[in-house]
Amino acid sequence: MIKPIGMVHRDGNPFEGIPLDADDHACVDFRFCADPKMRWWFDHHPTAFQPPALREIFDRAHEPTWFFDPKAPSCAGFIARTLATGWNWQPPTHLIDAVTWADKIDAATFSTAQEAVALELPAQRIAAWLANGRSGMDTARYIEWLSHASLAEVAERPEVAPQIAAIEEERAKDLAAIEKLAVWHDDVVVFDRFDDVGARNPGFLGYWLFPHAFYAVAGTRTESSIKITVGFNKWTTSTRKPTVDVGALCARFGGGGHSMVGGITLRGDELQRARETIAQLVAELTKH
């Protein structure tokens, strides 16, 4: 039986308190874990090794089931290609489709911001659901569902379809709230949604609403956690070039990510720290 455990970036060791007591363990799309019980590890984030000393352990031990490729568009695609090469694994058709979409969504290789926020296709609808308001139990079920069903079939499940419908119905409300909350610092736009507990992260909607934005910083929270995201608007109308490694910048505050996008997770009671962190992020993004 597979038991998914959702990991959260935080100060210190995020694996502390996570029981590694199963017959086998795998960590995917998350920071490196040097515990010898973690037999499988796949990641594609340049900030995977925190603290940096963990990179030395990875290079020295380099277990044959530890895999790292910061150039991979998505971890899902990286895993599929690695297993195909090393173990001759052939994914079923429905997973090939899921991996193709994972590469596109994770790397944001959409031609326009409008395409990025569309909710027309099953993969786009599932992506919106995964990004907004699903519970840890939903995520665990999603992993199980996707092991034997297509994205279209998962999107129509009774546990998922009503939540996707709610996202669609509330899209106009979210757009109005995001537009009203936008605060500009040069060409960096900030969306502080901390006062609306449970509010959705703007994600690509911010880029769609404000095509002249160069970077976007957003803050959202639930009762238990706070999430800060930082991203470069690859569809920006601005002519300046990105000079900030966003993932490395977020890593300085306990988070991580890629060169163009990153995130930071704090406890739900760290609101003051969250707003101070956003101010520091903006200062870094506007001085370049």
Can you name each region flagged by the protein language model?
Residues 107-200:
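Glycine-rich, Lys/Arg-enriched anion-binding loops that position phosphate/diphosphate groups
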